[in-house]
């Protein structure tokens, strides 16, 4: 047990013994159910050493497991070595879930502890019900991080800033009015908002408290008569204070949220999103509660014309930055550059634009077999040195004041094999099929998912991640309410939604291939008999790798689609490029 996190595991067990806790469940999130929590809340990482964005650690007095999905199997296997944790694979036949495993290993009357601040009401209720059914005790206030994490990073105190209404396309009064309309329709008096991206969108605020997502850590409460933001005072600049005052938003201390909720009249009804509000906050409320999805999610998911224009501008910046990075990569691939150098170079190119605010997630630059690790994150220690051969998968995104980007390209660094070209073309065919889809109003993502997977399925292959996720406007790179995946999601695709299109194939020990563009849902046609039909507009601006295409596998329709896309990329990016850069791009986009 040589790994440095192992002493942390033993310290946790010592605390468990002293508190008579037999098992503890540790998620990888924060009190806001954030995809990317601040360092202050990464207790799971501290105990286990696993750093993936999805994963749950479970510790008993004599065993420990880390549950994660297929995106992180290879990463987790490496990071958990010597940690005292066993990798447990989610959604794999024969593998027990967290609760199934606890049911097998715990004795009757065992006590299962959680930090109720980190579990949504639905999750906590599920664990509590499981405990009751199995004769276990449920302890929802086991706060281990405060007790054993001696060098815990402080809660971030970065200043918030106002997101310009000219970029947001709607002022705070208008947004809150629409939320209040949703409350009236649900016979609710108020709405508790805990998700950071919802608060940022609703109040036109942004921040830098969380890596990759420009949000500020806060809570909010909204009703017809009251607007309250719970935030650390250190984050409130004069500009932010004036902005909130203009829209009648009161400011209270971040830590006063439970006290405030406890004072809401017992006759009032507050709308609570059980998938986002924590168990700790839910238990603090004595008022009536109506459980339903926050109306902010749906409102935020449909972009207005200003936001769409911003997305298009961000794609121009990002496409030009990609061109410059790729030119540099081609010129230096034989000079000993690494996966990390690719990451740094693209950050440098993006930063040349004044509105850039960093990346929208940690770049995945996976060379050769590293590309088969779906959410691989290179470090200076793990990074491969590139050479003029093999495949390089680059999945990256930028944050700009105008919008958020997310793009994946797989490129050949030289001499692609027949197998690489075959697999690349299969992925491209699925990607193209989804991009050219026309579908009736009311269609859900699950109904379109097969378009992207079909070419792989025809050859007995698949991928285990989703095909598409929503993307925020200068917010989270991954958001809802829509998705395109095999699992059912009742949310239909609506006009103005921005969704990713990213099929992939991963061959362990060999390579990974993924191709991703962002798609905007736009009108296609309508008629009296059949109603409205929608289609997609590809927002992302960067060419596919034509050297990896097996032309015998492409139809005339697909060839035309590729050529039309490449012509658009050239036309739109050319004004941002130098003569040499434009010439490079035109070569990459020449007709096939």
Placement of each model-derived feature along the sequence:
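Active-site neighborhoods and metal-handling regions in enzymes and metal-associated proteins
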Residues: 1-592
């Amino acid at each position: 047990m040589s790994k440095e996190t192992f002493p942390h595991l033993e310290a946790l067990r010592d605390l468990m013994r002293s508190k008579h806790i037999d098992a503890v469940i540790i998620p990888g999130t924060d009190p806001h159910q954030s995809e990317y929590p601040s360092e202050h809340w990464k207790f799971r990482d501290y105990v286990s050493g696993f750093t993936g964005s999805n994963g749950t650690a479970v510790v008993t007095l004599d065993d420990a497991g880390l549950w994660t999905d297929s995106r992180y199997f290879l990463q987790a296997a490496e990071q958990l070595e010597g940690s005292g944790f066993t990798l447990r694979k989610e959604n794999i036949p024969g593998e027990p879930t967290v609760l199934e495993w606890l049911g097998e290993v715990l004795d009757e009357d065992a006590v299962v502890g959680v930090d109720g601040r980190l579990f949504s009401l639905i999750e906590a209720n599920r664990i509590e019900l499981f405990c009751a059914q199995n004769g276990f005790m449920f302890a929802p206030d086991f706060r281990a991080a405060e007790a054993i994490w001696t060098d815990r990073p402080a809660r971030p105190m970065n200043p918030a800033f106002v997101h310009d209404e000219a970029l947001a396309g709607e002022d705070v009064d208008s947004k809150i009015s629409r939320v209040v309309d949703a409350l009236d329709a649900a016979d609710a008096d108020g709405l508790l908002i805990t998700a950071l991206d919802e608060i940022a969108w609703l109040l036109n605020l942004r921040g830098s408290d969380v890596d990759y997502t420009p949000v500020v850590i806060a809570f909010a409460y909204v009703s017809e008569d009251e607007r309250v933001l719970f935030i650390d005072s250190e984050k409130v600049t004069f500009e932010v204070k004036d902005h909130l005052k203009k829209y009648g938003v009161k400011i209270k201390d971040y830590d006063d949220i439970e006290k405030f909720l406890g004072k809401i009249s017992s006759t009032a009804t507050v709308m609570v999103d059980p998938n986002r509000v924590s168990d700790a906050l839910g238990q603090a409320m004595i008022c009536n509660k109506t459980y339903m999805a926050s109306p902010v999610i749906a409102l935020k998911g449909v972009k207005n014309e200003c936001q769409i224009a911003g997305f298009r501008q961000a794609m121009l910046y990002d496409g030009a930055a990609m061109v410059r990075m790729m030119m540099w990569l081609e010129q230096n691939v034989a000079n000993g550059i690494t996966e990390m150098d690719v990451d740094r170079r693209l950050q440098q190119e993006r930063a040349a634009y004044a509105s850039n605010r960093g990346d929208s997630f940690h770049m995945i630059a996976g060379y050769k077999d590293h590309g088969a690790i779906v959410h691989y994150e290179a470090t200076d220690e793990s990074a491969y040195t590139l050479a003029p051969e093999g495949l390089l998968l680059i999945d990256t995104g930028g944050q700009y004041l105008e919008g958020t980007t997310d793009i994946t390209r797989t490129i050949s660094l030289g001499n692609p094999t027949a197998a690489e070209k075959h697999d690349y073309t299969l992925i491209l065919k699925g990607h193209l099929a989804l991009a050219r889809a026309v579908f009736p109003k009311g269609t859900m993502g699950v109904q379109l998912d097969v378009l992207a997977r079909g070419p792989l399925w025809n050859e007995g292959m698949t991928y285990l991640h989703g095909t598409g996720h929503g993307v925020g406007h200068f917010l989270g790179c991954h958001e809802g309410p829509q998705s395109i995946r095999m699992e059912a999601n009742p949310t239909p695709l609506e006009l103005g939604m921005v969704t990713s299109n990213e099929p992939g194939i991963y061959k362990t020990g060999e390579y990974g291939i993924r191709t991703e563009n962002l798609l905007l849902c736009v009108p296609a046609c309508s008629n009296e008999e059949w109603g409205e039909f929608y289609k997609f507009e590809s927002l992302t601006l960067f060419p596919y790798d034509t050297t990896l295409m097996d032309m015998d596998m492409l139809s005339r329709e697909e060839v035309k689609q590729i050529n039309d896309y490449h012509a658009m990329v050239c036309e739109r990016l050319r004004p941002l490029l130098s003569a040499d850069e434009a010439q490079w791009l035109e070569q990459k986009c020449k007709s096939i």
